[in-house]
Amino acid sequence: MFKDFFNRSSKKKKYVTVSDSKQSDVPAGIMTKCPKCKKIMYTKELAENLNVCFNCDHHIALTAHNRIEAISDEGTFTEFDKGMTSANPLDFPSYEEKIQKDQQKTGLNEAVVTGTAQLDGMTFGVAVMDARFRMGSMGSVLGEKICRIIEHCTENRLPFILFSASGGARMQEGIISLMQMGKTSVSLKRHADAGLLYISYITNPTTGGVSASFASVGDINISEPKALIGFAGRRVIEQTINEKLPDDFQTAEFLLEHGQLDKVVHRKEMKATLSNILKMHQEVKTNA
């Protein structure tokens, strides 16, 4: 089995099966286990494949910066508001410690990275949520950063792309967290009133208050295959309505079938799809 770890031949499989009891034998960072099919792959080769599993095609989460790198021209990204970090407005116990722990783990100050970049020479504003930080939960700083990049796009007449990945509102900030739903939606309404494009790219998972606000109101709503998208949890809904839900309920494919998404896009087609949309938008704006 261990020969397969070091055999780089293209004719060999790029993964091996490792039992749960043997996971500790795999050096940290060198190998990555697919959360879906449990196959073990070289982290470097997986990254080159945009974190798409070679075996089952599962779309493993990308970091915010890796996502931006995958959709933009090299060296064109300029980050905004990098130093903004959450306070503890409600004096919630241990909240500061949890924030600091996630900052050390991820290298981020918040659960979203915002800025401007170019794709095939076209400038756009972008916000990418990173679920490694507080599960991408929506707090006051996340809402403020998103509003600021939207306002920048509106003022400079730029299209805006937002990649969502979130467990919902951040409970440690209470009503202040919930206020971000309305706050971001108002900024997006102003952007729309200016006749500007907003692309919502919903990734796995996007739930709770994020799915009920800015993630669902794009001019064009896109998602990745099998992404979990919903408000309340499956069990909560089943217990509330006392009915069994379809197996594919709250998946991107289910939402596409029911008209809540415009397209489900494989990650390898993500950059080309966004480029085509931006080009069409530019042509419409030029001819208007």
UniProtKB/Swiss-Prot annotation:
GO BP annotations, alphabetical order: fatty acid biosynthetic process; malonyl-CoA biosynthetic process
Its signal peptide is none
Which keywords does this Swiss-Prot/TrEMBL entry list?
ATP-binding, Cytoplasm, Fatty acid biosynthesis, Fatty acid metabolism, Lipid biosynthesis, Lipid metabolism, Metal-binding, Nucleotide-binding, Transferase, Zinc, Zinc-finger
| Pfam families xref list | Carboxyl_trans (PF01039), Zn_ribbon_ACC (PF17848)
- Location (main, coarse): cytoplasm
- Supply the EC number(s): 2.1.3.15
Coiled-coil annotation reads: none
Write down how the cofactor binds this protein: Binds 1 zinc ion per subunit.
Q: Which reaction does it catalyse?
A: N(6)-carboxybiotinyl-L-lysyl-[protein] + acetyl-CoA = N(6)-biotinyl-L-lysyl-[protein] + malonyl-CoA
Question: Which enzyme type, at the first EC level?
Answer: transferase
Tell me which SUPFAM superfamilies the record gives: ClpP/crotonase
Where in or outside the cell it occurs: the entry states: Cytoplasm
Q: Which residues bind Zn(2+)?
A: 34, 37, 53, 56
Gene Ontology terms: cellular component: acetyl-CoA carboxylase complex
**Needed co-factor(s):** Zn(2+)
Q: Source organism's superkingdom?
A: Bacteria
- Keyword flag Zinc: yes
Domain CoA carboxyltransferase N-terminal, residue spans: 30-288
GO MF, one term, reads: zinc ion binding
Positions annotated as zinc finger (C4-type): 34-56
Q: In which pathway does it act?
A: Lipid metabolism; malonyl-CoA biosynthesis; malonyl-CoA from acetyl-CoA: step 1/1
Concerning NCBIfam families, the annotation shows: accD
Q: Which family is this protein grouped under? A: Belongs to the AccD/PCCB family.
- Function, in words: Component of the acetyl coenzyme A carboxylase (ACC) complex. Biotin carboxylase (BC) catalyzes the carboxylation of biotin on its carrier protein (BCCP) and then the CO(2) group is transferred by the transcarboxylase to acetyl-CoA to form malonyl-CoA.
Subunit info here reads: Acetyl-CoA carboxylase is a heterohexamer composed of biotin carboxyl carrier protein (AccB), biotin carboxylase (AccC) and two subunits each of ACCase subunit alpha (AccA) and ACCase subunit beta (AccD).
Protein name per UniProt? Acetyl-coenzyme A carboxylase carboxyl transferase subunit beta
**Which species is listed as the source?**
Staphylococcus saprophyticus subsp. saprophyticus (strain ATCC 15305 / DSM 20229 / NCIMB 8711 / NCTC 7292 / S-41)
